[in-house]
């Protein structure tokens, strides 16, 4: 343990734990006050800063389009002759199951019901237009923008890990072209990584907050187990045991196998519901929803309800409660998902990673909403089951299983659905614990150390379990979203970082004929590296010193000209004179020239010393570099 613990990035490891405890203990000791403060912060974030999240969503989409159609997208993540580490089916299953979790089972079934009774655009609840938008908005919130936000960190992280061969999986390392090596490895970089871990732990608590009641409801239907905190704690314990073992086994034997089981199980469930339910209705409604989404994509992506509360405009708070909150939610999970996507995409081009993630991720989410969601909508519209009434009276989990109970062989369907909830939760937390272990480890050329993965696996379940019993889980969920606010700036920096790094390296490559670009020649010195920044500083100081020397020469010339003018005046007068006997204009010119010369000489000496110190610093940085 002693030797392996030396690989741990201790400031990040202990800093993240300290920040988490600093937030959690006040929530435990003062739950009401903590909840009020977090609620105020969340309202400020969504109401006053919501336009920033909407802008980021569009910027993320635009950036992914740029990546796909630029030379950056053709860069291969790995060696020139390297095949993808995972087959496409396994890769798609891993990124979908690892990035979505049981949340898709929850919201895929019931999200439409919230839109149905509280629709966007000031529509009448339960109206025909409300029905159409209820079937559409889920696709929007879980579609290309969500996956584009997920992928912002994935590009620079994958590039630095597989192309530049940096054995770390950290957000701070991916920011090196923007922050510089010194800041990236220093305090600013540690703060970025700590904030990421805190946001991820809080976000994970939210996922468990959805999954545990959902699984408990399923067990209640199947076995009559009571729906209380103790049962939910037992559920979390089972999920923890599954993903702890999977995390211990690693990517190939753990996450990959669980994801494949989950993927095919989910496809089987969706196929059965599609066949057993109102097939034509689900297909036609799904197709109509896709068309409505495409026709109104930019309207939905930019709508912030700006006129709400003015005149006759009603302030429904829909975009703040749903779209903006969703974008903030995806942003909190983006670093972890980006790290995970980067880790499993070896052997693919950046274009394949980006386009594949958006396509398979959006497609998977669309299928859940188009089949499970539209099945519930059909029950509501046909009068077979008042899903909305059950939702309002008994909660979302009861409404979901009441829907499933209407299917043929409902007991088997509920059993499969509950099992999928367990495995979805396990795969999500498996990938999160893997990423957390990677972030706090200084070298991950292979896989994070097993004890490190196990530590985070149990931390992920222990924290939500305690807060669930104490009633502070929902507050932590909101706190994580609020705490992710700095990620708005970090996301922009990550996009800039990706462009800077790839552009620099592409300039060092020969002309390519093949569509895939293999980065073979790297610059001798990166401008953001310690030696690159030291050299740039030396060049800057040297230029300043040379400019000061030139100003000194100009000052000498000006003084000589004044003295020449004085000599001419004295000769003209035909007698010797003291300085104070000269005309006032000549006295002032002489004093000004001498003062100017003195100032430029002092400045030259100062800047020359700074240039010399910068040169010494550069030599020291180069001397401290490890031998290749």
Regions from the PLM with identified roles:
Residues 107-119, 161, 165, 273-296, ...:
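Extracellular/periplasmic helix-exit of transmembrane alpha-helices
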């Amino acid at each position: 343990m002693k030797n392996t613990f030396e690989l741990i990035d201790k400031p990040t490891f202990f800093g993240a734990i300290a920040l988490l405890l600093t937030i959690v203990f006040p929530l435990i000791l003062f739950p009401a006050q903590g909840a009020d403060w977090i609620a105020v912060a969340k309202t400020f974030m969504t109401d006053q800063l919501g336009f920033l999240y909407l802008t980021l969503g569009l910027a993320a989409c635009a950036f992914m389009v740029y990546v796909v159609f630029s030379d950056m997208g053709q860069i291969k993540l790995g060696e020139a002759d390297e095949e993808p580490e995972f087959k496409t089916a396994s890769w798609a299953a891993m990124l979908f199951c690892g990035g979505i979790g049981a949340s898709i089972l929850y919201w895929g079934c019931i999200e439409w019901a919230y839109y149905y009774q509280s629709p966007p655009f000031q529509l009448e609840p339960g109206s025909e237009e409300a029905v159409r938008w209820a079937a559409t908005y889920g696709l929007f919130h879980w579609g290309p923008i969500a996956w584009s936000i997920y992928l912002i960190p994935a590009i620079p992280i994958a590039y630095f890990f597989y192309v530049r061969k940096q054995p770390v999986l950290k957000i701070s390392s991916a920011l090196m072209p923007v922050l510089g090596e010194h800041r990236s490895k220093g305090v600013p970089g540690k703060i970025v990584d700590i904030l990421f871990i805190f946001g991820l732990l809080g976000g994970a608590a939210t996922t468990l907050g959805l999954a545990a009641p959902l699984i408990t409801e399923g067990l209640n239907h199947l076995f009559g187990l009571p729906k209380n905190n103790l049962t939910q704690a037992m559920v979390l314990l089972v999920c923890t045991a599954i993903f702890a073992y999977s995390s211990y086994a690693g990517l190939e034997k753990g996450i990959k196998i669980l994801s494949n089981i989950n993927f095919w199980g989910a496809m089987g469930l969706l196929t059965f519901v599609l066949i057993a339910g109102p097939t034509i209705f689900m297909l036609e409604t799904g197709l109509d929803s896709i068309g409505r989404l495409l026709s109104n994509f930019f309207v939905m992506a930019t709508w912030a309800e700006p006129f709400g509360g003015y005149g006759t405009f009603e302030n429904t708070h829909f975009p703040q409660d749903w779209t903006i909150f969703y974008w903030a939610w995806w942003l909190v999970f983006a670093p972890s998902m980006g790290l995970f996507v980067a880790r499993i995409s070896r052997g693919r081009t950046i274009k394949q990673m980006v386009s594949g993630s958006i396509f398979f991720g959006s497609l998977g989410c669309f299928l859940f909403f188009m089949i499970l969601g539209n099945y519930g909508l059909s029950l509501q519209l046909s009068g077979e089951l008042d899903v909305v009434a059950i939702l309002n009276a008994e909660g979302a989990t009861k409404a979901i299983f009441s829907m499933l109970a209407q299917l043929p062989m409902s007991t088997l369907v509920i059993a499969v659905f509950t099992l999928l909830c367990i495995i979805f939760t396990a795969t999500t937390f498996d990938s999160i614990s893997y990423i957390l272990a990677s972030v706090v480890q200084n070298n991950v050329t292979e896989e994070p150390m097993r004890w490190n993965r196990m530590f985070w696996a149990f931390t992920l379940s222990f924290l939500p379990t305690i807060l669930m019993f104490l009633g502070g889980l929902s507050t932590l969920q909101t706190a994580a979203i609020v705490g992710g606010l700095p990620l708005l700036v970090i996301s922009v920096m990550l996009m800039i970082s990706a462009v800077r790094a790839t552009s620099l390296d592409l300039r060092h490559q020969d002309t390519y004929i093949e569509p895939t670009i293999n980065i073979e020649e790297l610059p001798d010195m990166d401008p953001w590296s310690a030696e690159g920044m030291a050299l740039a500083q030396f060049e800057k100081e040297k230029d300043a010193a040379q400019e000061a020397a030139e100003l000194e020469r100009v000052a000498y010339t000006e003084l000589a000209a004044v003295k020449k003018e004085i000599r001419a005046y004295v000769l003209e007068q035909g007698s010797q004179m003291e300085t104070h006997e000269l005309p006032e204009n000549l006295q002032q010119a002489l004093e000004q020239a001498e003062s100017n010369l003195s100032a430029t000489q002092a400045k030259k000496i100062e800047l020359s010393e700074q240039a010399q110190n910068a040169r010494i610093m550069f030599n020291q940085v180069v001397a401290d570099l490890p031998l290749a």
